[in-house]
Amino acid sequence: MTQQAKVARTLTGKVVSDKMDKTITVLIERRVKHEVYGKYFTKSSKVHAHDEKNECRIGDTVTVAESRPLSKTKTWALVKIEERAAEV
């Protein structure tokens, strides 16, 4: 048997909530073309991601990767923080 390494899916989005312990909510937006009319529009989805060190803050741009289910709704894990939000 040959072992093939599975490549985890990664997405980039913005942190919209960090109120939970070791969990962040990430808003992922993508541009989609309408099949009939050809107009581009924005679709978005929110995912819960595991943040082991509680280092993310609201407004940060992050990369998350698919992982095994960690809870009922949490199946993504934080890979890295791309850009920090401005301190107010």
Swiss-Prot record:
PROSITE patterns, per database record: RIBOSOMAL_S17
Domain of life: Bacteria
One Gene Ontology biological process: translation
Pfam families with a match to the protein in the record: Ribosomal_S17
UniProt keyword Metal-binding, yes or no: no
GO CC terms in record: cytosolic small ribosomal subunit
Assigned keywords, A-Z: Ribonucleoprotein, Ribosomal protein, RNA-binding, rRNA-binding
Alphabetized GO MF terms: rRNA binding; structural constituent of ribosome
Family indicated by similarity: Belongs to the universal ribosomal protein uS17 family.
Record NCBIfam families: PRK05610.1, uS17_bact
Subunit structure: Part of the 30S ribosomal subunit.
Its biological purpose: One of the primary rRNA binding proteins, it binds specifically to the 5'-end of 16S ribosomal RNA.
Descriptive protein name: Small ribosomal subunit protein uS17
Native source species: Cellvibrio japonicus (strain Ueda107) (Pseudomonas fluorescens subsp. cellulosa)
Gene responsible for this protein: rpsQ
